[in-house]
């Protein structure tokens, strides 16, 4: 570039005004930022949040105590104790605990479950004050399942073609 062209460019401040125009265009464009606690963005049906144990529509818990989720958990965060076999030959859990401090939210437990009993739900706001509150027992997991059942069923139905 010649010295004359360089001088004309710097005197006319072409780059400066180009930058101002670009800034003004972006200033008046619609914003992509959400004001988080007041506005929440959409979550994917495959989102892996807080764990929950589901029930059948008749109220019976789904978990059949097969312990596949306990076996596949890479963080060894799941502990299950199976009860004795019932008269109809089925088993249910006596104890189902998840240590959420250990959990890495990989979703293997959900994928391994043959009856869709353990799922990772849409809730991601479960911060606590103590570590003990992050130790989920069977009652807490069933309560989560009852609270989020509509969203859980919808997410599983949306994800069904890909399973």
From Swiss-Prot:
Annotated 4Fe-4S ferredoxin-type domain ranges read: 53-83, 94-123
Q: What is the lineage of its organism?
A: Bacteria, Pseudomonadati, Pseudomonadota, Alphaproteobacteria, Hyphomicrobiales
Keywords tagged on the record: 4Fe-4S, Cell inner membrane, Cell membrane, Iron, Iron-sulfur, Membrane, Metal-binding, NAD, Quinone, Repeat, Translocase, Ubiquinone
Cofactor(s) the record lists: [4Fe-4S] cluster
Could you tell me which species this protein originates from? Chelativorans sp. (strain BNC1)
An example Gene Ontology molecular-function term: 4 iron, 4 sulfur cluster binding
Q: Which PROSITE patterns match?
A: 4FE4S_FER_1, 4FE4S_FER_2
* Gene3D superfamilies named in the record: 3.30.70.3270
Question: PANTHER family, alphabetically?
Answer: NADH DEHYDROGENASE [UBIQUINONE] IRON-SULFUR PROTEIN 8, MITOCHONDRIAL, NADH DEHYDROGENASE UBIQUINONE IRON-SULFUR PROTEIN 8, MITOCHONDRIAL
Metal-binding: is it a keyword of this entry?
yes
Protein name as catalogued: NADH-quinone oxidoreductase subunit I
Q: Name one GO biological process term.
A: aerobic respiration
- Listed binding positions for [4Fe-4S] cluster 1 are 63, 66, 69, 113
**Reaction catalyzed:** a quinone + NADH + 5 H(+)(in) = a quinol + NAD(+) + 4 H(+)(out)
Q: Where does [4Fe-4S] cluster 2 bind?
A: 73, 103, 106, 109
Q: Which NCBIfam families match?
A: NuoI, PRK05888.1-4, PRK05888.1-5
An example GO CC term for this entry is:
plasma membrane
């Amino acid at each position: 570039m010649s010295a004359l062209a360089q001088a004309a460019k710097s005197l006319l401040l072409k780059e400066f005004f180009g930058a101002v125009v670009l800034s003004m265009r972006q200033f008046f464009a619609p914003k992509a930022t959400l004001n988080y606690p007041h506005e929440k963005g959409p979550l994917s049906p495959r989102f892996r949040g807080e764990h929950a144990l589901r029930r059948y529509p008749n109220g019976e818990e789904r978990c059949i105590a097969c312990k596949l989720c306990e076996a596949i958990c890479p963080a060894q965060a799941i502990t299950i104790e199976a009860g004795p076999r019932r008269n109809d030959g089925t088993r249910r859990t006596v104890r189902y605990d998840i240590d959420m401090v250990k959990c890495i939210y990989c979703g293997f437990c959900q994928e391994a479950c043959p009856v869709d009993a353990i799922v990772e739900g849409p809730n991601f706001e479960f911060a606590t004050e103590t570590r003990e509150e992050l130790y989920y027992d069977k009652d807490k997991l069933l309560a989560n399942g009852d609270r989020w059942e509509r969203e859980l069923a919808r997410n599983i139905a949306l994800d069904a073609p890909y399973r």
